[in-house]
């Protein structure tokens, strides 16, 4: 069983039914969008591949953005990178970015809990990654660290592979194409 509940605006022509078992809807900007997955549809004995796309930094554009933040970032404690001017507009931009991370963290927890509640977590490997940095100069569309250094977390709940010490950080180069 395969599913993708996010956009799949790939740069090639394809038939979505050849890639995913799940139905989809058409979005005017992003092409095809998968429908939200109900983890109870998956069983312990059925292998699956799923892609769950989170809004990430784009949460700030949603009307209820502020309502979803449990503890807003203290703007007075934000330290901007040395190459940026200490400007209230930039501080607010960074604060909203950090606030959006809280929402992403909550959504990831909901996914993990959904897998756990449906007794399929122990048979799952979760890959968490981002496509680019935040939407600010020297990030997202630029070949600087802010646009290239994105999170990659692999959590093996199956315990089938060589364990890596919890909290281990690795700075080796990984290509998103490999994932």
Go through the PLM ranges and name each one.
Residues 39-176:
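Active-site-proximal cap/lid insertion segments
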Residues 179:
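Catalytic core of tubulin tyrosine ligase-like
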